[in-house]
């Protein structure tokens, strides 16, 4: 170590060493660490936010040079946060994920009064209604800043919502005083996250500003679509294998019933199907004497089974008619052969 380096090391106060050590310990304790902007936050609101984050996140303020030194010494990529250490900032650390941290900080923001000389973050409106202030000079102050105010029913009334300063304009002394008198706090103060580092990834506020419920619904919808695609494409995965097996079993059973494949698993269904077909066929025969005794006075099965049975019966009837027609043709052919033989015998007798 050179004399200059040794002299520089000796000049570092002990309290700074201790401060950096505590900051490094904080950085190494939590999963997610961010840099937040605290500019313009009154001490009261800052303390309220610190209490609101208690148990969920830790907020630590220090000199920027010490924050940078701690981020560099902690390593593991945390030094990427040093670019955000500028102005009035602090470190916030949590075991929550970056999206959860962002939501915590947004929810911790509170309304605050605005001072003269500040830029209006949005349109500043004096709302319609009773101000609760007795008649006096204050009505003139309201009118001076552009509020439609009158004395009515023994008090100062604002007759309609009045924009007294538009977004982006500088707040005047008169507007600041009137707002303070009315107890209107037009701006929102809170810890603005500049960047957060978690599990080796640096996140910006723009990346974290999402609707968590909507995002969760999108993920669930995508997962359901992927599952359906896997099942319909017969692509087995750990999650879809049970569904594919159940689907295959159902399709195999349906095919077995349609093809009347003999199987112990299909025996009961095949017997039920055959019974329905027999009953449907028996119901189509008008002559009960032509039926076995056990099939006499039977009713046709229910509509679904009956439709299937009727189709089968019609097919069988068509086959029977076709068979009878074939038999008739054969009989005609036999008769023709007999007639031909008889004619030949007659000619033989005629010509000796």
Curated annotation (Swiss-Prot):
Comp. bias intervals (Gly residues): 343-352
A matching Pfam family: Ribosomal_L10
Ribosomal protein is among the record's keywords: yes
Keywords associated with the record: Ribonucleoprotein, Ribosomal protein, RNA-binding, rRNA-binding
Molecular-function GO terms, alphabetical: large ribosomal subunit rRNA binding; structural constituent of ribosome
Binding partners and assembly: Part of the 50S ribosomal subunit. Forms part of the ribosomal stalk which helps the ribosome interact with GTP-bound translation factors. Forms a heptameric L10(L12)2(L12)2(L12)2 complex, where L10 forms an elongated spine to which the L12 dimers bind in a sequential fashion.
Family indicated by similarity: Belongs to the universal ribosomal protein uL10 family.
Note: Was called L10e in this organism; in this case 'e' is for E.coli-like, not eukaryotic-type protein.
The name this protein goes by in its record: Large ribosomal subunit protein uL10
Source lineage: Archaea, Methanobacteriati, Methanobacteriota, Stenosarchaea group, Halobacteria
């Amino acid at each position: 170590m050179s004399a200059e380096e040794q002299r520089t090391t000796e000049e570092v106060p002990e309290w700074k060493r201790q401060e950096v050590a505590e900051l490094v310990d904080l950085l190494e304790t939590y999963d997610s660490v961010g840099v937040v902007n605290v500019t313009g936050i009154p001490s009261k609101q800052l303390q309220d936010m610190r209490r609101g984050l208690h148990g969920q996140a830790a907020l630590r303020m220090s000199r920027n040079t010490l924050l940078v030194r701690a981020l560099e010494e902690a390593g593991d990529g945390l030094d990427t946060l040093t670019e955000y250490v500028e102005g009035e900032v602090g470190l916030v650390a949590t075991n929550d994920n970056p999206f959860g941290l962002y939501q915590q900080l947004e929810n911790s923001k509170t309304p605050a009064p605005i001072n003269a000389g500040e830029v209006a973050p949005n349109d500043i409106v004096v709302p319609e209604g009773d101000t609760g202030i007795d008649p006096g000079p204050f009505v003139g102050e309201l009118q001076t800043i552009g509020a439609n105010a009158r004395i009515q029913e023994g008090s100062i009334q604002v007759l309609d919502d009045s924009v007294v300063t538009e977004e982006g304009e500088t707040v005047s002394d008169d507007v600041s005083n009137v707002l303070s008198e009315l107890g209107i706090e037009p701006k929102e103060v809170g810890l603005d996250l500049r960047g957060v580092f978690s599990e080796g990834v640096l996140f910006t506020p723009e990346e974290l500003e999402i609707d968590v419920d909507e995002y969760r619904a999108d993920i669930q919808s995508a997962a359901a679509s992927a599952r359906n695609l896997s099942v319909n494409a017969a692509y087995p995965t750990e999650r879809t294998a049970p569904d594919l097996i159940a689907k295959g079993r159902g399709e195999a059973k349906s095919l077995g019933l349609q093809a009347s494949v003999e199987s112990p698993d299909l025996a009961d269904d095949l017997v039920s199907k055959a019974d329905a077909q027999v009953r449907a066929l028996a119901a189509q025969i008008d002559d009960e004497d032509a039926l076995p005794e056990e099939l006499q006075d039977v009713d046709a099965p229910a509509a679904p089974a009956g439709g299937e049975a009727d189709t089968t019966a019609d097919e069988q009837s068509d086959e029977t008619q076709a068979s009878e027609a074939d038999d008739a043709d054969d009989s005609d052919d036999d008769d023709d052969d007999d007639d031909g033989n008889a004619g030949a015998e007659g000619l033989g007798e005629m010509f000796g």
